[in-house]
Design a protein with these regions (language model features):
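Pre-Walker A (Motif I) flank of P-loop NTPase domains
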Residues: 2-6, 42
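Hydrophobic positions on the alpha1 helix immediately C-terminal to the Walker A/P-loop
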Residues: 19-23
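Conserved inter-motif catalytic segment of the P-loop NTP-binding fold
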Residues: 12-14, 38-121, 125-128
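Conserved Walker
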Residues: 31-39, 149-155
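Active-site catalytic microenvironments for nucleophilic, acid-base chemistry
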Residues: 26-30
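Conserved hydrophobic/aromatic pocket- or pore-lining residues that grip, position, or stack substrates
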Residues: 8, 24, 46
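Phosphate-binding/switch region of NTP-binding enzymes
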Residues: 7-8, 13, 17-18, 102, ...
Length: 202
């Protein structure tokens, strides 16, 4: 949703970070992914709490190797060292200065700064911080272990406040390293989207 919040959630190793970078690359280059990403190009910013710039650049490079049409523009990158709310003044200024239209937060739990994710106030504070940033956002979240009904880890308010949520499922071929990804729209404030499938070749 334009100017609103979407959350993608799934277990570790389900290629959530890959997907976040891929979506950022599509927006940067104005390439549409039906049902998920608009075709109008725009600047994107990737907030990384989990890895480093070298890792992000390597992954982006692999995407471009397989899709040369995406070589024209690349997302801005920021390695995060403190909670999202604590970085708001600098982030807001940077978003305005660079004309950022799409923000990826990887990951939601780290961006909350170690607060109790089961506490509703943590979810409220997180989304309140996002609303102060003048752009559309995608947050990448984990799921609880050993549950039959996967949901965003922590308070149900992470789901309730998000305008849209997608569950990601992944199967990786151990021989080739290629991953088949399924995306399932679990919540939509306007209308639900059909499931989507992607394949990332190693």
């Amino acid at each position: 949703y334009e100017q609103l919040t979407t959350v993608i959630f799934g277990p570790g190793g389900s290629r959530k970070s890959f997907l976040g970078l891929w979506l950022a690359l599509l927006v940067e280059n104005g390439v549409a992914l039906e049902g998920a990403v608009r075709a109008v190009p725009g600047r994107t910013l990737y907030l990384d709490y989990e890895a480093d710039q070298a890792t992000a650049e390597y992954r982006l490079g692999r995407f471009v190797d397989g899709n040369p049409a995406l070589a024209h523009a690349s997302p801005s990158y920021r390695r995060m060292k403190q909670p999202l709310a604590a970085d708001l003044p600098v982030l807001s200024a940077s978003i305005v200065e660079q004309g950022i239209v799409f923000l990826i937060v990887d990951s939601l739990a780290m961006a909350c700064g170690g607060k109790d994710l089961s506490d509703p106030s943590t979810a409220v504070s997180y989304f309140s911080a996002l609303r102060q940033l003048p752009c559309t956002s995608l947050s990448i979240a984990h799921v609880p272990k050993n549950t039959e009904n996967p949901m965003i880890y922590g308070s149900v308010f992470f789901t309730n406040i998000a305008r849209m949520t997608w569950e990601i499922k992944c199967q990786t071929d151990e021989d080739t390293g290629s991953s088949t990804i399924g995306l399932f729209n679990r919540k939509a404030n306007e209308r639900r989207h059909r499931p989507m499938g992607l394949q990332f070749a190693h």
